[in-house]
Structure formats: structure tokens, C-alpha cells
Amino acid sequence: MFVDQTKIDVQAGKGGDGAVAFRHEKYVPLGGPAGGDGGRGGSIILVADSGLRTLMDFRFRRKFKADNGENGRIKSQYGRGAKDVRLKVPMGTSVYDFNTGELLGDLVKNGQELVVARGGKGGIGNIHFATPTRTAPEIAENGEPGEFRTLRLELKVLADVGLVGFPSVGKSTLLSVVTKAKPKIAAYEFTTLTPNLGMVVLPDGRDFSMADLPGLIEGASKGVGLGIQFLRHVERTKVILHLVSMDPNNGRDAYEDYETIRKELAGYTKDLTSKKELIVATQMDIPGSEEKLAEFKKKLGDKTVYPISSVTHQGVSELMGKTADLVEEVAKEEAEKPAEIKVAEKEYVYKKPEDDGFKVERTGEHSFIVTGNKLERLVQRTNLDHTDGIMLLARKLKRMGVDDALREKGAVNGDDVSIADFTFEFVD
């Protein structure tokens, strides 16, 4: 089954907690600090794989979770970091944040990686908190939570050439003639329900990939027929072969069909109509097709038309040669364009923008809540089981301006203040 869209949940692992431990050493208070750091939590990574053609693997399993990092140990030993979870996806997969719609990355090259949920950092142990005046610190950090994200995966077929047109204009037949692909072919509309891919190899050694896309009809860009779910596959093609039937018995106006498809491409995105296009008049082996072709050319004006018959192979070689020329031309133009965004071929890590701000809100007569990404992470990473940890957090909150902000909102001694899942009394 061809699956080109899916939704998945990814949960990275939590970082391990730092340890509070002490050495047994003569004349050193409590033996000296010896608590090791926690290990990093596992990340979730998508990897482009040239051997896959569909998102079928995600149809029945849609939740993925990486392991947590190990906690720090005694004797200054670090906890082990968790293994990353690597999920293989087809080349051509676009990854979106499901909730915001933001494009996180495009996986278009074999082996390219995208980190979609980062594992939490491990907390540091008490060996890092020793000072000349605090020789036996009972402070360690908790590990950071791993990121959670809901993703929308969308596969856009990677092909140099896309075949577009109304149903039953001969797209699948042409693909079967010029490649080794074996698409389903029948004399009824919408025989092709999923994109078919094939490789065209010319006698001169040139080659290019070709995709036969399901037939479009009027209103496709708004979801009519197979519609918009397949229009996106045209986006990555370099060249469009626009097939128009010259069968005089189908009761259709060739020029109107051509204009309708062009309108639907533009309705999806203007970028599609700016692609290189070859107009292909198909089914030229049918009696009466020459007259229909002449009328079609007259209405088109000065645009070039390539008449072919996939049955007799009339004009097919010339069409493939011209197509190869255009593919090379577009590839050269793309290579000469300055890259707008540089993306590493091997690994592209999506990172959330850092938010240093915070907000104070009154939730009751004597209660307040303070929110902010950086602030909440600070609280989550502080080990609140030890007095030293609580005192350190209080000093950091004061330096960040939280105390002053609470006073401005009217906080007084004894009021409750909540940050993340931690609640404490305000002391002025």
C-alpha cells in the first residue's frame, strides 16, 4: 500500500539525574563530593533511506519513545547516555510540526538525518558544586526532560520528470514504454491511484527518473477527485510533461483540458506553473487524431507540441531526448543558484528558539504563577530534595529578576508562587 502522509508522536528520553555522593577519605568533610553526572537521554532521529518508497511503516505504529539516560553514580562515575532512536523514512519526506504547521526539514538525500526530538541533558553531580567554603555540597542537578513533538510526515515523490494530465490520457502507458515500470493500465478513469516511478535510460547514456501521477480533474487543487493529495508530488519535479489526449472519440476539447490542468497547478502553488513544461499530444495512432491536433495547435498559438503514440512509439524517442535536455538545463540552473538555506547533507538538527523571558500572573488573592521556558527548565533541573539545592535555586531566581517581578505584581511574605510543578512561599 502506498502511504504518503502520516502523523506520529515522538518522545525523546529524559537526561539522567546527577548524583549526590561522597568519598570516604580521612580528614576531608564527609569524604569530599563524588557524585557523577547523569547521562544524556536518547534523541529521536529521522533518516532518509533510498530503499523505501512509502511511509507504510508508520501506518500501524505511531508512537516512538527513546530511553532515558542513566543517573550519575558514586565515585564520580557518569551515567550512561541512552541510545538514539533512528526511524527510516523515504527520500523526499517533508517533516512538519503538527501543531504549528512549521516545516522542520526536508530529507532529500540518502543518509540525511533530522533530529526531531532532542534527548534531555544529564544533570551534573555534586562534584561540580564544591567551593572553598562549601566543601561538602549536597547539590546536584536533575536531568532535563526529553522533547516531545507531534509530527506530520509528508512524502513528495522525488522524480526529475512528472507526468500530469486528465485521467486516461496515456500517462501510465507512456511510463511503461520508456521505463521498466509496470503501472496498472486500463481503459477507465483513475486506474492509477498512487504515483508510479521509473527510470528512463537513453541510448546516449543519459538518464532521468519519471513519475506517473494520478489523473487530475477540475477542482483538484481544492480536493476534488484524487485532488490535492497528489498535486504535492509535482512540487519536486524538474520538468513537467503535460499529456493531452488527441482521441477524437472522447468528447473532450483538448485545449480546454490543457487550460484546466494549468489552472489547477496554479491553484495549488504558482511554483508549479513556473516549471519547465513540454506539451505532449498523446494517442496519435487513433484515426482522426491529426485533425484534433491541428485544432489544438491553432488554439495554443506559438507553443510547441510533441505528438506521440505509445502504441506505435511515434515521436517517443524525440520526446525523451528533449526531456533529457530540459532536465539537464534545470539541474544546471539550480546548481548556479545561490543557496538560500544551507542544510548539512548528513545531519540537520531542528532546535527550538531559546526563550529567556518569563511572565508573572496572579492566580488568587495570595497566589502567583511564573511561566517561561528557561525558568521552568531551571526548576526542573534543580534537585529540590536537598536544602542546598533550594537555596541555590532561590539565588538564581533573584538574579533573573523573578523576585522583583513578583513584588511589582503585589506579592508579599507568605504568598504561594508556582513555577512548573514546584510551589514555594514568597519571602521578601
Swiss-Prot record:
Q: Which InterPro entries match?
A: G_OBG, GTP-bd, GTP-bd_Obg/CgtA, GTP-bd_prot_GTP1/OBG_C_sf, GTP1-OBG_CS, GTP1_OBG_dom, GTP1_OBG_dom_sf, OBG_GTPase
- For binding GTP, which residues are annotated in this chain's numbering? 165-172, 190-194, 212-215, 282-285, 309-311
The OBG-type G domain is annotated at 159-328
User: What Pfam families would the database entry show?
Assistant: DUF1967, GTP1_OBG, MMR_HSR1
Residue ranges of domain OCT in the record = 350-428
Question: Which molecular function terms from Gene Ontology are attached?
Answer: GTP binding; GTPase activity; magnesium ion binding
A Gene Ontology term for the protein's cellular component:
cytoplasm
GO biological process terms on file: ribosome biogenesis
EC number per UniProt: 3.6.5.-
Query: Taking the first listed entry, what is the main subcellular location of this protein, grouped into a coarse class?
Result: cytoplasm
Look up the domain of life of the source. Answer: Bacteria
- Alphabetical UniProt keywords: Cytoplasm, GTP-binding, Hydrolase, Magnesium, Metal-binding, Nucleotide-binding
Record bears the keyword Magnesium: yes
* Function of the protein: An essential GTPase which binds GTP, GDP and possibly (p)ppGpp with moderate affinity, with high nucleotide exchange rates and a fairly low GTP hydrolysis rate. Plays a role in control of the cell cycle, stress response, ribosome biogenesis and in those bacteria that undergo differentiation, in morphogenesis control.
Assembly and interactions?
Monomer.
Q: What is this protein called?
A: GTPase Obg
